[in-house]
C-alpha cells in the first residue's frame, strides 16, 4: 500500500507472482504519480487468475493523479489494468496496453476523469477499454482503442443528476457485437471531427445512448461495414427537445436482409428526439440498408443521405 502525495515507487527488474484471485499489484491512496518520474514499474508479472494491476483511490475534492505510460501485456481473463475511484487517470502517448484474454478492462473509473492518449488493444471477448461510473472519459486525437467481440471502447454510466461527458477524437476499432461509445443516464457523447469509429464485424454499434436528456453528436467518421450494424443509436429519452445530430460521415456496408438491415441513425424515442442530419452530414449506405429510422427527422443545410 502506497500512500501520500510525496510517495514514489521505483521498481526495476525482478518479477511479481500473484497466486490469489482478485489480488492487486499496487494499492495507491492519495498519490500523484507519473511514469518515468516518481513511478517506475519495469518488472515482470505472472498470475494464475484474474487480478487488478493498479488500484488507485483519492477523495472527493482531493483526487489522486496517475499519469501512466508503459508497455504492458495482460495474460489473464477477468483482469482490470487500472481501477480508480476519485482519481484523474491519464494514459500517456507512451502507454500501450494489450491483451487477447476475455473480460479484460483497461481503465475502470468511479467518480473521476479518464484520458487516453495511448494505445489499448483488448481483443478478447467482452472486454472494455475505458469504463466509467459518474466519470468523464476522453479518447484524445492520439488515442487508439481496439476491442474484440461483444466489447466496448468507451462506456459511461451515470446515476446522478449531473452531466458527464464522453469524447472521442481518436480511433476506436470494434469487433462484432461491440459498441464504440455508450452512455447511460445524463451522459453527453460526442465523436469529434477527428474521431473515427470503425468495424467490419457483424452487429456493431458506433455510438449508443439510453436515457438522460443529453444530445448524441457525431462530427467525425463512423464506418461500419458489417451486417446489422447501427451508426448512431438512441433510446429511452423521455423528455422533448433531444437531438441525435450528425455533421460527420456515417458509412454502412451491404445488408443481407432488408427486413433486418444496417441503419445509419436509429432513434426509438418517438417525437422526443429530433434526428438532425445537419450541414456537412453524410449517411452512405450499402445495399438494403436504412439511412435514418425515427419519427422526427430533419435534413439541414447540405446534409445528405444515400441508402439502397
For every predicted segment, state its role.
Residues 1-22, 32-51, 60-78, 88-103, ...:
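Beta-strand-rich solenoid/repeat architectures in extracellular/passenger domains
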Residues 84:
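Anion-recognition interface
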Residues 110-112, 133-135, 185-187, 211-212, ...:
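Short glycine/proline-enriched coil/turn segments at helix->beta-strand junctions
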Residues 158-160, 184-186, 210-211, 236-238, ...:
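Short aromatic-glycine motifs in intrinsically disordered, low-complexity regions
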